[in-house]
C-alpha cells in the first residue's frame, strides 16, 4: 500500500465521508485515496495528517512523496 489513510481513519474512528466533508472533496475522491487508486497531492496529505492529528509518515510511505528517479 502506498498510503495508510484507510488504516488511520479506522484507528481514529473517522469515516471517508467525514474526511471528504473536512477537505471539501467528494466522497468518491476520498474512496480513491483510501483504496490507493490514486494519491492526493502532498498539501492534502499534510492537511489529512493535521485533521487526524498524526505525523505525515503515519499516513504515507516516503517513496510516494519522493519517488526514486529511475536511472
What are these regions (language model features)?
Residues 43-58:
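DNA major-groove recognition helix of helix-turn-helix/homeodomain DNA-binding modules
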Residues 25-39:
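Recognition helix of helix-turn-helix/homeodomain-like DNA-binding domains
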Residues 18, 29, 58:
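Residues in the helix-turn-helix
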Residues 1-5, 25, 42:
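Secretory-pathway ectodomains
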Residues 7, 13, 32, 50, ...:
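Short, charged recognition helix plus adjacent turn
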Residues 3-22:
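Short basic helix-loop element that most often maps to the first helix and adjoining turn
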Amino acid at each position: 500500500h502506498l498510503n495508510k489513510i484507510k488504516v488511520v481513519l479506522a484507528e481514529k474512528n473517522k469515516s471517508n465521508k467525514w474526511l471528504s466533508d473536512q477537505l471539501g472533496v467528494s466522497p468518491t475522491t476520498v474512496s480513491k485515496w483510501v483504496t490507493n487508486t490514486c494519491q492526493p497531492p502532498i498539501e492534502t496529505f499534510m492537511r489529512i495528517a493535521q485533521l487526524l492529528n498524526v505525523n505525515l509518515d503515519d499516513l504515507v510511505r516516503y517513496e510516494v512523496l519522493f519517488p526514486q528517479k529511475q536511472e
